[in-house]
A protein has these predicted regions:
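Extracytosolic ligand-binding ectodomains
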Residues: 1-218
């Protein structure tokens, strides 16, 4: 039994809809379904309703600062159920904004956040280690997965143009759709004419906040 609390943005609504769609496939019952607005600064009313439900865990479908407010309010109303966030808050900024309340929160994220925790044989390790080092040296701030997405998008395009031997749109498109085994910061990309995302669930690691930092759930 799971409770949902979701924001009102496009990402939030999309995730909320997908959660409702897939929950029955995994035998999950959504027993509470609360929402909050983009300008809301207090979600204790929604969380108090969730506390009174029969939920065994809570999932926050949110992006931006909303999930940090949810996390702080979550502890304030005395909720002790497992709290899961989305990859939409996969950055150190979320931990900073949430403070000690973030301890124990879990969320799926790309390997870019935890290169030092990857096995040496992991194909992403050299890629994400170098990106994190170079990004933080250049910008003097913690790396986040969002910059990594932009980097991957650019490098996939460059790779496709090189393989196409041209900047002709149709040829570049065909080259992109034939991308196989591209190791990026967000995962190993395998595209096709029907799959322009190119990633599967192996692109995500389940992370947990411990002592104000990321740890891997094994």
């Amino acid at each position: 039994k799971v409770a949902l609390i979701s924001g009102s943005g496009g990402f939030d609504k999309s995730m909320h809809g997908e959660c409702l769609k897939v929950a029955p496939k995994y035998g999950i019952e959504v027993v509470a379904d609360e929402t909050y607005g983009a300008a809301d600064t207090d979600m204790t009313a929604q969380l108090t309703k969730i506390r009174a439900s029969s939920a065994q865990a809570v999932l926050n479908a949110g992006f931006g600062q909303g999930p940090a407010i949810v996390t702080r309010n979550y502890r304030q109303v005395g909720l002790t159920l497992p709290l899961y966030q989305s990859h939409g808050v996969a950055s150190k900024e979320y931990i900073k904004l949430s403070g000690p309340a973030a301890e124990g929160v879990r969320l799926p994220a790309a390997a870019l956040l935890v290169p030092e925790l990857l096995a040496d044989k992991d194909p992403q390790k050299p890629i994400v280690t170098a990106y994190k080092r170079d990004y933080e040296a250049r910008f003097k701030t913690d790396v986040s997965t969002f910059g990594g997405h932009a980097y991957d998008g650019l490098m996939l395009a460059v790779n496709a143009i090189k393989r196409a031997g041209s900047t002709d749109k149709a040829k570049v498109r065909d080259a992109l759709e034939s991308t196989r085994g591209y190791v990026g910061t967000g995962g190993v990309v395998n595209m096709s004419a029907s799959d322009h995302m190119g990633l599967d669930l192996s692109a995500f690691l389940m992370l947990e906040v411990k002592n104000g930092n990321w740890s891997m759930v094994r």
